[in-house]
Curated annotation (Swiss-Prot):
The lineage of its organism: Archaea, Methanobacteriati, Methanobacteriota, Stenosarchaea group, Halobacteria. Belongs to the universal ribosomal protein uL14 family. SMART domains: Ribosomal_L14. Binds to 23S rRNA. Forms part of two intersubunit bridges in the 70S ribosome. InterPro entries: Ribosomal_uL14, Ribosomal_uL14_arc, Ribosomal_uL14_CS, Ribosomal_uL14_sf. This is Large ribosomal subunit protein uL14. One of its GO terms (biological process) is translation.
Protein backbone atom coordinates (compact mmCIF):
# COMPACT_ATOMS: atom_id res chain seq x y z
CA UNK A 1 0.00 0.00 0.00
CA UNK A 2 1.40 3.38 -1.02
CA UNK A 3 1.74 6.44 1.18
CA UNK A 4 -0.65 9.29 0.47
CA UNK A 5 0.54 12.65 -0.85
CA UNK A 6 -2.02 14.61 1.14
CA UNK A 7 -2.16 15.30 4.86
CA UNK A 8 -5.28 13.30 5.71
CA UNK A 9 -7.03 14.26 8.92
CA UNK A 10 -8.85 11.18 10.08
CA UNK A 11 -12.54 12.02 10.15
CA UNK A 12 -14.21 8.69 10.99
CA UNK A 13 -14.00 6.79 14.24
CA UNK A 14 -15.17 3.38 15.37
CA UNK A 15 -18.97 3.28 15.41
CA UNK A 16 -19.46 5.88 12.64
CA UNK A 17 -22.30 5.30 10.18
CA UNK A 18 -21.28 5.87 6.55
CA UNK A 19 -22.95 5.38 3.18
CA UNK A 20 -22.01 2.60 0.80
CA UNK A 21 -21.10 4.05 -2.60
CA UNK A 22 -21.43 0.93 -4.75
CA UNK A 23 -24.15 -1.36 -6.09
CA UNK A 24 -23.57 -4.39 -3.84
CA UNK A 25 -26.93 -4.01 -2.10
CA UNK A 26 -25.64 -2.34 1.08
CA UNK A 27 -26.83 1.22 1.76
CA UNK A 28 -25.44 2.07 5.21
CA UNK A 29 -22.29 0.74 6.90
CA UNK A 30 -21.10 0.91 10.50
CA UNK A 31 -17.34 1.09 11.14
CA UNK A 32 -16.37 -1.75 13.48
CA UNK A 33 -12.56 -1.63 13.27
CA UNK A 34 -9.70 0.00 11.39
CA UNK A 35 -7.02 -2.29 9.97
CA UNK A 36 -3.47 -1.21 10.68
CA UNK A 37 -4.45 1.31 13.36
CA UNK A 38 -2.17 1.46 16.38
CA UNK A 39 -3.16 4.21 18.76
CA UNK A 40 -2.66 5.23 22.35
CA UNK A 41 -4.45 3.60 25.28
CA UNK A 42 -8.06 4.80 25.69
CA UNK A 43 -7.99 6.62 22.34
CA UNK A 44 -10.82 5.96 19.90
CA UNK A 45 -9.62 4.24 16.70
CA UNK A 46 -9.88 6.61 13.72
CA UNK A 47 -9.92 6.16 9.95
CA UNK A 48 -9.43 8.62 7.12
CA UNK A 49 -9.49 8.81 3.36
CA UNK A 50 -7.97 5.72 1.72
CA UNK A 51 -7.94 3.61 4.90
CA UNK A 52 -9.08 0.00 4.90
CA UNK A 53 -11.78 -0.64 7.49
CA UNK A 54 -14.00 -3.47 8.69
CA UNK A 55 -17.69 -2.63 8.47
CA UNK A 56 -21.03 -4.14 9.38
CA UNK A 57 -23.96 -3.60 7.01
CA UNK A 58 -26.80 -1.88 8.91
CA UNK A 59 -29.16 -1.07 6.01
CA UNK A 60 -29.51 -2.78 2.68
CA UNK A 61 -30.93 -5.89 1.05
CA UNK A 62 -31.82 -8.77 3.38
CA UNK A 63 -28.91 -10.84 1.99
CA UNK A 64 -26.37 -8.10 2.78
CA UNK A 65 -27.64 -6.97 6.20
CA UNK A 66 -25.67 -8.00 9.30
CA UNK A 67 -22.64 -9.10 7.26
CA UNK A 68 -19.15 -8.11 8.37
CA UNK A 69 -17.05 -7.00 5.37
CA UNK A 70 -13.90 -5.10 4.41
CA UNK A 71 -14.24 -1.62 2.88
CA UNK A 72 -12.14 1.37 1.79
CA UNK A 73 -13.04 4.97 2.70
CA UNK A 74 -13.41 6.99 -0.52
CA UNK A 75 -15.03 10.22 0.78
CA UNK A 76 -15.08 12.07 4.09
CA UNK A 77 -16.61 15.32 5.32
CA UNK A 78 -13.55 16.42 7.27
CA UNK A 79 -11.21 18.47 5.02
CA UNK A 80 -7.89 17.03 3.88
CA UNK A 81 -4.91 19.19 2.91
CA UNK A 82 -3.12 18.57 -0.37
CA UNK A 83 0.58 19.44 -0.94
CA UNK A 84 -0.31 22.53 -3.03
CA UNK A 85 -2.22 23.97 -0.06
CA UNK A 86 -5.76 23.32 -1.25
CA UNK A 87 -8.26 21.65 1.04
CA UNK A 88 -10.78 19.11 -0.18
CA UNK A 89 -13.92 17.92 1.59
CA UNK A 90 -16.97 16.02 0.44
CA UNK A 91 -20.68 16.21 1.22
CA UNK A 92 -20.80 12.79 2.88
CA UNK A 93 -18.74 9.99 4.37
CA UNK A 94 -18.68 6.99 2.02
CA UNK A 95 -16.91 3.68 1.54
CA UNK A 96 -16.67 0.93 -1.06
CA UNK A 97 -16.87 -2.76 -0.14
CA UNK A 98 -13.77 -4.66 -1.31
CA UNK A 99 -12.71 -8.31 -1.44
CA UNK A 100 -9.49 -9.88 -0.14
CA UNK A 101 -7.55 -8.64 -3.22
CA UNK A 102 -8.73 -5.04 -2.59
CA UNK A 103 -10.90 -5.11 -5.72
CA UNK A 104 -14.38 -3.54 -5.39
CA UNK A 105 -17.20 -6.07 -5.09
CA UNK A 106 -19.64 -3.79 -6.92
CA UNK A 107 -19.53 -3.04 -10.63
CA UNK A 108 -20.18 0.71 -10.39
CA UNK A 109 -19.43 3.50 -7.90
CA UNK A 110 -21.83 6.30 -7.06
CA UNK A 111 -20.41 9.80 -6.75
CA UNK A 112 -16.83 11.09 -6.86
CA UNK A 113 -13.76 9.56 -5.22
CA UNK A 114 -10.68 11.38 -3.96
CA UNK A 115 -7.49 11.42 -6.04
CA UNK A 116 -5.56 10.03 -3.06
CA UNK A 117 -7.74 6.91 -3.05
CA UNK A 118 -7.29 6.51 -6.81
CA UNK A 119 -3.50 6.58 -6.43
CA UNK A 120 -3.51 3.95 -3.69
CA UNK A 121 -6.20 1.61 -5.09
CA UNK A 122 -6.02 1.33 -8.88
CA UNK A 123 -8.91 -1.11 -9.17
CA UNK A 124 -11.25 1.33 -7.40
CA UNK A 125 -10.04 4.14 -9.67
CA UNK A 126 -10.81 2.12 -12.80
CA UNK A 127 -14.40 1.59 -11.61
CA UNK A 128 -14.97 5.25 -10.62
CA UNK A 129 -16.52 7.78 -12.97
CA UNK A 130 -15.42 11.00 -11.21
CA UNK A 131 -12.03 11.52 -9.54
CA UNK A 132 -11.61 14.79 -7.61
Amino acid sequence: MEALNADVTQGLEKGSLITCADNTGARELKVTSISGYSGTKNRHPKAGLGDKITVSVTKGTPEMRRQVLEAVVIRQRKPIRRPDGTRVKFEDNAAVIVDENEDPRGTELKGPIAREVAERFGSIASTATIIV
